[in-house]
């Protein structure tokens, strides 16, 4: 992004729309500055110290790119949509959303309103971003569109590795298949949603062959990822159909210009963004020193999730200063886990364990088995970490250790009952000392198998690295992403 683009964005937000009689404009603190950081990307820093509880950004509703505003902009050209909004908004006038006529606005004229209102927010915004980008300077949103990342900037999101027409797609697919299973599963789920959304959106163009709107997959992907990575929570008005469907929650999103430059941490944020009556506001939750970044918090998400959704992780793995071939962590995401659900579930699939499974389901302890970080400390450049199985994982292993014949169904209580020792452990009367030794043996066997699989993947990544061209930066970047996610698991195994 050019500096001139960010300047133009702020000018756009700070200049009232000529058709707006209320002269609505954004209010952004002069103490803030957009920075294009080499490692963190676009971000916002403080020019001067900012105190706690300071309102630093106020973006009016007019500049929020969300479901309702898209409908309003299209309604200037579409009579059916104009009527729909007039019936629901008092004194509504589409004149505020006037823009130059072009082939895209001709398409807006003929869009079927009922078909449009069936879209989720993600689908509608994908459709709208693709079309508005084609309008160029004719679009009201032109300053925002110029500041959105280009498609190559999403290259670290794994789902993008097996889509598109890159001449290195075969190599990227090999690298993708070496990702941890959980990341592959999440990426495939994202791809399924992407293709479902774009198929739905594409149906708007099949009936308009007279217009040149042949949308490429890359255009859809750019728009879809922009929305997926840069949206904030936004409660839609209840009079919109999308507010009453099963997609209500996933459709409660908006894009917020300028605010979307704020970077995120898993914890220790210094600002909070929230919907307000006038639009969207950002307030500091701690003092922000001169030169410091403004941070929001993502919440308790592990690196797998962050890599899939946003294309980065919060753990930092670097070459050791004293040994170039050794790797060392300078930060580690405390929400990282080792997934054991598939392995333990397979052990429970034994027909003899049917009563055990029923008891686990009854108590709410069936599934979601992980090893997590107990404690983590960085001291003089080294990381000291301890990891342990979650309580529900320990309960499941204890249930596997017990004789399945001791699990019974009580006709009196109409409930499944477990052995007394397990009942006391489950109820929290002890810490499961009775099972500790056997639990450790089972875990050790499981973790050695996982570690062996991870080492095999690292070996294959080395083979791919040796095969690719030294100047193939795209493939090298993807290899590094996979290596880090694998090493996250390996270092946790060593810390159990």
Regions found by a protein language model. Name each.
Residues 65-146:
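Eukaryotic helix-linker segments that join adjacent hydrophobic helices
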């Amino acid at each position: 992004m050019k500096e001139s683009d960010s300047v133009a964005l702020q000018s756009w937000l700070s200049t009232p729309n000529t058709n707006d009689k209320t002269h609505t404009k954004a209010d952004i603190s002069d103490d803030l500055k957009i920075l294009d950081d080499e490692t963190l990307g676009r971000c916002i820093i403080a020019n001067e110290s900012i105190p706690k509880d300071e309102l630093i950004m106020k973006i009016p509703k007019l500049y929020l790119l969300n479901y309702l505003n898209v409908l309003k902009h299209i309604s200037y050209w579409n009579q059916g949509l104009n009527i729909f909004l007039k019936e629901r908004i008092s004194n509504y006038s589409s004149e505020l959303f006037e823009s130059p006529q072009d082939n895209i606005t001709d398409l807006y004229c003929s869009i079927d309103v009922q078909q449009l209102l069936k879209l989720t927010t993600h689908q509608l915004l994908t459709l709208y971003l693709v079309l508005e980008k084609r309008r160029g300077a004719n679009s009201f949103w032109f300053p925002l569109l110029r500041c959105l990342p280009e498609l190559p900037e999403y290259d670290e999101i794994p789902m993008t590795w097996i889509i598109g027409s890159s001449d290195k797609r075969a190599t990227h697919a090999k690298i993708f298949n070496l990702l941890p299973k959980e990341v592959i599963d999440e990426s495939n789920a994202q791809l399924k949603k992407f293709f479902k959304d774009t198929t739905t959106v594409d149906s708007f163009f099949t009936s308009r062959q007279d217009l040149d709107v042949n949308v490429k997959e890359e255009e859809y992907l750019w728009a879809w990822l922009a929305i997926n990575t840069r949206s904030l929570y936004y409660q839609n008005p209840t009079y919109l159909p999308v507010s009453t469907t099963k997609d209500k929650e996933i459709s409660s999103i908006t894009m917020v210009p300028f605010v979307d430059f704020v970077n995120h941490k898993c914890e220790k944020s210094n600002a909070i963004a929230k919907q307000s009556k006038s639009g969207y506001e950002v307030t500091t939750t701690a003092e922000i020193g001169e030169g410091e970044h403004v941070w929001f918090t993502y919440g308790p998400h592990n690196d797998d999730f962050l890599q899939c959704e946003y294309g980065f992780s919060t753990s930092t793995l670097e070459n050791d200063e004293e040994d170039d071939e050794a790797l060392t962590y300078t930060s580690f995401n405390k929400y990282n886990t080792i997934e054991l659900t598939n392995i333990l579930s397979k052990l429970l699939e034994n027909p003899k364990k049917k009563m055990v499974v029923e008891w686990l389901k009854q108590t709410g302890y069936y599934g979601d088995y992980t090893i997590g970080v107990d404690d983590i400390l960085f001291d003089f450049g080294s990381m000291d970490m301890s990891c342990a199985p979650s309580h529900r994982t320990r309960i499941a292993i204890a249930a596997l250790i017990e004789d399945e014949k001791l699990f019974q169904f009580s006709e009196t209580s109409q409930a499944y009952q477990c052995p007394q020792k397990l009942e006391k452990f489950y109820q929290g009367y002890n810490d499961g000392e009775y099972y500790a030794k056997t639990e450790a043996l089972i875990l050790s066997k499981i973790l050695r198998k996982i570690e062996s699989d991870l080492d095999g993947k690292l070996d294959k990544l080395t083979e791919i690295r040796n095969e690719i061209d030294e100047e193939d930066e795209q493939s090298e970047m993807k290899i590094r992403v996979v290596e880090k996610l694998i090493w996250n698991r390996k270092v946790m195994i060593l810390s159990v």
